[in-house]
């Protein structure tokens, strides 16, 4: 959520491909019509990886998920996996890249702040997304320089 908002605030995307940055939140299966409306999707999300450390970043094709990715974390992670699989079973899944980070578990406390590890990982994730978009021919212009720590407390308002 925070990284998608950071991308919306800090960058303008132009070129032969339309880029929409959408905070899917916890909409899970409600995202299926949205996902199927695109030719290509990049999902930015939390992942669980056996033996991984908080803040580790993974970048992979959904049709070639690394063996260390277990999808055993939060209900949200499982819902995203189910959403992508349901879309795939229907034959409507476009190519999907996933940029994932191992999160810090916050327990029962609701918070919009990021752990230090995930905040640091968000810089790597931002670079991965931007580099990949450029590889796809998207022209990127930086229009602001907000940090993830500035964005996070306001993410609930949307951007």
Swiss-Prot record:
* Keyword Protease tagged: yes
The UniProt GO MF terms for this protein read: aspartic-type endopeptidase activity; enzyme activator activity
The record's keywords, sorted A to Z, are:
Aspartyl protease, Hydrolase, Protease
Query: Gene3D superfamilies, per this entry?
Result: HybD-like
Q: InterPro entries of this UniProt entry?
A: Pept_HybD-like_dom_sf, Peptidase_A31
Q: In terms of domain of life, where is this protein from?
A: Bacteria
* UniProt GO BP: protein processing
Name of a matching Pfam family: HycI
Q: Write down the SUPFAM superfamilies for this protein, in alphabetical order.
A: HybD-like
Write down the CDD domains for this protein, in alphabetical order. Answer: H2MP_MemB-H2up
Q: Write down the PANTHER family for this protein, in alphabetical order.
A: HYDROGENASE 1 MATURATION PROTEASE, HYDROGENASE 2 MATURATION PROTEASE
Q: Which family does the record claim for this protein?
A: Belongs to the peptidase A31 family.
UniProt name for this protein: Protein HydD
Q: Name the gene for this chain.
A: hydD
